[in-house]
């Protein structure tokens, strides 16, 4: 049985079939790559989305650097999402929104977070009670891959909503 009527139709049908096969191949490759991701990779991706949300939250609110109080450069890559209690010393607070705020790269990286000024401005922003609760929080939190996937999707969606509502 003939499936095409002419040479032109055969060429078109062949191109269409190849495009469909390539699309299916990309889909299966993407699924295989997702399965190969380690917990560490998921942690990095979740942290990236969380940090993006924090920067967007503080940009929309019009906040400056949490340490210096200066206006931040939102146009380039000069703003970090700085943690009050560092991820190294308090990994259980890495996804805590009270623990993370927009901060200049200078304060975050070269002044080691400028913790004294960070704390003073954090008290102004969220209050002494919440800062003390943050400092006292030693509850261990262990994130498995499914938790990290959920965190990544949650903050990706929240950042998208903030950006859409701000526009």
Regions found by a protein language model. Give the residues of each.
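Short flanking/linker segments adjacent to small metal-binding domains or redox-active Cys/His motifs
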Residues: 137-167
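Polybasic, low-complexity binding patches
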Residues: 29-30, 88-99, 109-145
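Short, charged surface segments at domain edges that flank catalytic/cofactor-binding sites
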Residues: 26-64, 142-145
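Histidine-centered nuclease catalytic patch
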Residues: 64-100
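Flanking scaffold residues of small Cys/His-coordinated metal-binding clusters
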Residues: 1-4, 60, 95-99
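Short, non-ligating residues that shape and space the ligands of small metal-coordination modules
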Residues: 11, 15, 74-79, 113
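Cysteine-rich micro-motifs
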Residues: 1-13
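Short, cysteine/histidine-rich loop/knuckle motifs that typically chelate Zn2+
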Residues: 7-8, 65-69, 106
